[in-house]
Amino acid sequence: MAALPEQAGAAGTPGPYVFAEGTETVEGATSNVEGHRLSPGRSYKSTLPRAGQRFYRLELDARESAYVSVTAIPKPGTQVSYADGVEVSVQDADGGNCTPLEAEEARFGSSESPRPITATASRRVGPDEKSCAEAGTYYVVVERTRTSRSAREPQDSRESQDSQGSQGSQGYGSSEASPEDWDLEIHVASEPVLKAGDEAEGEKEPPQSWDSSTPVPPTGERRPREGGTSFSSARGLEGGVWGAEIESGQTLFYRVPVDWGQRLSATAELGSSSVDGSGGSAERGGAVRRGTARGSGYVSSALVMSLYNPVRAQVDDAHTAYDGRQKSAALEPLPPIAYENRFAPADEVATMRFAGWYYLAVHLSSGVAEKFGDGPLELTLRVDVEGDPKPGPAYAGSPRPADEFRVTERDAAAARRGETAAAGGGAGGGRDEVMAVVAAGGIGAGVVLLGILGVWTLVARRRAAAAVATEAVATEAAVAGATGVAPGAVAEHTERAEHTERFGPPRRW
């Protein structure tokens, strides 16, 4: 029997990217004919070299859409440029792409800070889908972004660009791409077609109107909740005001259950820096921070918050610069979850097509430590889920993973307790697998396994309770008094939710 799942993401500093327990390690092939088969409902670990394509294989029927997300995970300290990133496509036997775009991409953008980034491609079925609609073999193709100058330009060309300098960041392609392989997490999900006669089956248009006004962020006491380091270790959140410490270079993952008919909003706030005005050190919450005077530094795209839907397709991102004073970044207004949203031309609407767990990934640029010291900063998340749940579409089959596109009472409880998927609070949790074994193993084996399940449940609950208790007694660092803005300090500037620059080209779902 597999080991009992760990309660990842307890209070404390998150470690490296955490892959889900039982994740199979596979090697990407250099040819499509050798591609390892990927199955819907499962996650895989792989690697991606600096150059070259890697192939994987899907066997799909004609009654399910498939969504393949690829999360690229550079090692901490890796040099990345604006255009560096990962791209993924699903192709048929003739090399044709199954999505309107040539490939789906995710890039590091102007933050130029290494972190997990995710791109998602799909093969869709339905009355209006003409390509890749037949049952058969399809291929997943993954590579680093071909438009990345740091990966494809000759060295002398890069040096010529570097000599010209840049403003605000390292510049487009100004740093040489790391030669190391990147880790990959590949997640495959499937969505069945609708039952004949389902009301949503005849819908071909997105909702004509919805409240697009900017939601009012929730207020109230800030409750501590440390984030996870990956999709599988993302900590559950319900609506409210949540706080954590975030260090330069870290990415914190959270997940929020959003049901059909409900609307999600989120704002991330970064607290002020408390380094002293002499470039020395200052105490902050019992720790010593070292850096330059508050207001004398400036980091473009210092805080990046990305929202992903249940199949890990990016919905929206928001980012803000940082000059030592408190800043915030908010997602654009999003529509209520509806099956018909998939027919909308705007990605921010089209990706809000599923009920289930939505993921928030919050990253603090590695450049912040250079300007404002190496200690953590205070992060505040204001999350709200508006509206009453509505009945979802009637699928002609079961999604994979199971319960992927709905919100259960167990999900709501997991969000309240801050549980991760490994603790049994999400689709694909280990408890469902044990129950399947009990059902298939007969009475004798079932009694033994139910006893183990009881111990498992008790341990998971105690771990979750311990994590919450630890958070509850955690003291929040007092923000030091302002030392005054140095002469000539940069004026307040925020790049929040303006979308003058996205972290990757426009996607089309």
Locate predicted features.
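Extended, solvent-exposed segments with strong compositional bias
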Residues: E104-G126, S232-R235, V241, A321-M352
